[in-house]
Amino acid sequence: MEIDAARDHALPPDQQPWPNYRPQPGDAPRDCPRCPRLVAFRDGARALHPDWWNAPVPGFGDPYAWLAISGLAPGMQGANRTGRPFTGDWAGLLLFDTLSKFGFTTGTYDARSDDGLGLCGAFITNAVRCVPPQNKPSPVEIQTCRPFLVDRLKTLPNLRVVIALGQIAHQSTIKALGGKLPKHPFGHGNVHRLHTGPVLIDSYHCSRYNTNTGRLTVPMFEAVFEAALALR
């Protein structure tokens, strides 16, 4: 694989783009070493695309948000390229259009991390912070990255509702919030009330595949946000 062949020629950390990046609470360090497979994949991407972000993607949004959106992981040409969750790929188009419709955005989304877009009342994060091969993190990688999700959710003092995009995000978020999976099965539109903490709402992931196949439609996705607003 081209990524694997190039990984030994990655630029050293001090030559990477965004050398002054400093992670905030709940974000992974730029050269996080916890998952060897993801580190190797990340290094290969740095060698092939030295101007891309190619690092754990930090959360994005309002630090006083009442709504959090938990995705799966960065896409190779989306967040892994731009350094902002859901920015630069198909899933971001639907997500940010929906956030805008429901009044969560300031500025205009233009698929770039420097487009001036802001979020008001909402925050976006991922279950896994690094881009995984074939968009499929392993169970061990999901578990290893979960402490960052736990810490990120704890940094949001006004959090009332979390929307989980897809089954993996659902499972990791349930565990991050201290819930038990058998009591909280995934299903689009399912609402999960845990003993403490925010309410969790499930949604199919807003991926190109799900929208092209009709598994997720725009009205279905918007209904999830309507439910979130009703639970605020």
Residues covered by each model-derived region:
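A polyanion-binding, active-site-adjacent surface
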Residues: 3-232
